[in-house]
Regions:
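N-terminal hydrophobic/helix-forming segments and targeting peptides
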Residues: 2-6
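Glycine-rich phosphate- or other oxyanion-binding loops that anchor nucleotides, phosphorylated ligands
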Residues: 7-10, 34-254
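Short, conserved "active-site rim" segments that organize catalytic pockets and cofactor/ligand binding
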Residues: 7-27, 44
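Assembly/interface hotspot detector across virion components, adhesins/toxins, and nucleic-acid enzymes
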Residues: 29-33
Length: 254
């Protein structure tokens, strides 16, 4: 990794395209470059240099993406941003959570220590229309579909208010590189809410859900259409709130 300078960018790691695009819309100017077959967006947010990429879902992809971004951009700090599920009745869909710790699911990385963000949550500039929660985050090995699964995980990890699939390995690589980091997650589904489909069945080799396979699945289950429309609308609104929160945090570093 190159030596950090005052012009080193802020790194932003997302998991899927929808999250990345919402943040990429903030970059002006913006340029695209590739390194080792991975696409990176480089540009500025209100004059502050940033470098942005996505990993795809899952531990190994997240770890590779973190290593790649650190090597490609030599960031001075890292923002891990994207979607999450709620593990608490008090954390609602459409809200933002900035975890005060992140843990790894035991079936992914047994006996690994909890990691604490090295950038304090209080550094994030607040906006009136975005509700920000605190609480722990657990990184799991799959998309959690049913309320019963959420309750079981929450019972094992009572201090965790949200769940994702990428944050722990991303934070772990930042720790190894001695790069300050923070997590910004937007809630796509409530604690007492089942997902409209088992999206695990439609994840492609790139770690993204296949739009064509999801569309086919919905056509075969036409009664799911209203729930999918509602889910998609909320996901886009949540992606925009994630981008707003990331924007405000970047401004706080200026």
């Amino acid at each position: 990794m190159e030596t950090e300078s005052k012009d080193s960018p802020i790194g932003i790691l997302t998991s899927v395209r929808q999250e990345m695009v919402a943040i990429a819309c903030l970059l002006n100017p913006i340029s695209l470059f590739k390194r080792n077959g991975v696409s990176y967006y480089h540009g500025e947010i209100d004059g502050i240099p940033v470098i942005l990429t996505r990993s795809g879902m899952g531990w190994e992809r997240a770890q590779r993406a973190a290593n790649g971004l650190i090597g490609a951009g030599s960031p001075k700090s890292l923002i891990i941003a994207g979607f999450a599920a709620s593990l608490s009745p008090g954390v609602k869909r459409g809200e933002i959570i900035i975890p005060d710790c992140v843990q790894a699911s035991q079936n992914l990385a047994p006996d690994t220590p909890s990691l604490t963000p090295s950038i304090p949550m209080d550094d994030v500039i607040r906006t009136p229309h975005i509700h920000i929660n605190k609480g722990g985050l657990i990184t799991h090995d799959r998309i959690v579909i049913h309320t019963s699964e959420k309750r079981a995980i929450a019972g094992v990890h009572p201090n965790c208010a949200s769940l994702d699939m990428e944050s722990y390995p991303m934070a772990m690589e930042a720790e190894k590189a001695k790069i300050p980091w923070i997590i910004v997650r937007g809630i796509t589904d409530d604690f007492n809410e089942d997902m409209p489909l088992d999206f695990n069945r439609y994840v492609g080799a790139n770690g993204e859900t296949s739009a064509s396979l999801v569309a086919l699945a919905v056509c075969l289950r036409f009664w799911k259409i209203p729930a999918m429309i509602d889910f998609g609308k909320n996901a886009q609104q949540t992606a925009d709130k994630i981008a707003d929160t990331v924007h405000n945090f970047i401004l706080s570093l200026a």
